[in-house]
């Protein structure tokens, strides 16, 4: 596994273990708190570090496992082509754009006082970048197990997230944070500079 992807997975797993060990304060201080920040009244409305730190926290083992699997799957391939710096830029920019999108939607439509945790926005940014770099690479769905080109997979996933976000069918998931993460991945694909050059085989 390339270095950045490996270190990022290790960091996420390590912080989740701290959460399990009783680090309830981690969520209070480092999750993304929209709305009036009612989870911790002494905090300001929004502290800047939350725009990044929320991505290192996870709500459950399944939440962590799914995100780390996707991070390994897409981040590994991208890092081999782009290099660590560009992948890191895409990931963390996606984390920030995902947070900003969630705050914008929560502020405009309300109902967004629950804290947001998880690496999903960063993963979505890498997923879009992966589909742009490898549009015809086949991705196998977990359920149902149907292979499809990466570009089709991303399009279907985006439409599903948009539907779930607008209708509120699946509560407890920050769908607009996921969608906002796409912006960071696209931006780095469009305007970022690659790391090591490579030849197509």
Question: Where do the language-model regions lie?
Answer:
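A detector for small-residue-rich transmembrane helices and their helix-helix packing motifs
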Residues: 1-201
């Amino acid at each position: 596994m390339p270095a950045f992807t490996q270190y990022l997975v290790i960091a996420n797993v390590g912080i989740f273990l701290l959460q399990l060990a009783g680090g309830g304060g981690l969520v209070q201080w480092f999750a993304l708190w929209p709305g009036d920040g009612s989870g911790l009244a002494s905090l300001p409305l929004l502290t800047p570090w939350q725009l990044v730190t929320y991505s290192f926290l996870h709500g459950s083992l399944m939440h962590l496992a799914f995100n780390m699997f996707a991070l390994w799957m897409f981040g590994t391939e991208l890092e081999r082509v782009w290099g660590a710096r560009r992948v890191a830029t895409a990931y963390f920019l996606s984390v920030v754009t995902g947070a900003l999108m969630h705050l914008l939607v929560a502020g405009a439509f309300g109902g967004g006082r629950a804290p947001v945790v998880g690496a999903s926005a960063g993963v979505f940014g890498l997923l879009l970048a992966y589909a742009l770099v490898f549009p015809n690479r086949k991705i196998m769905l977990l359920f149902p197990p149907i292979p499809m080109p990466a570009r089709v997979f991303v399009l279907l996933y985006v439409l599903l997230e948009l539907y779930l976000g607008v209708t509120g069918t699946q509560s407890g998931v920050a769908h607009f944070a996921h969608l906002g993460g796409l912006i960071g991945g696209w931006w780095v694909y469009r305007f970022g500079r690659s790391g090591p050059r490579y030849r197509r085989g």
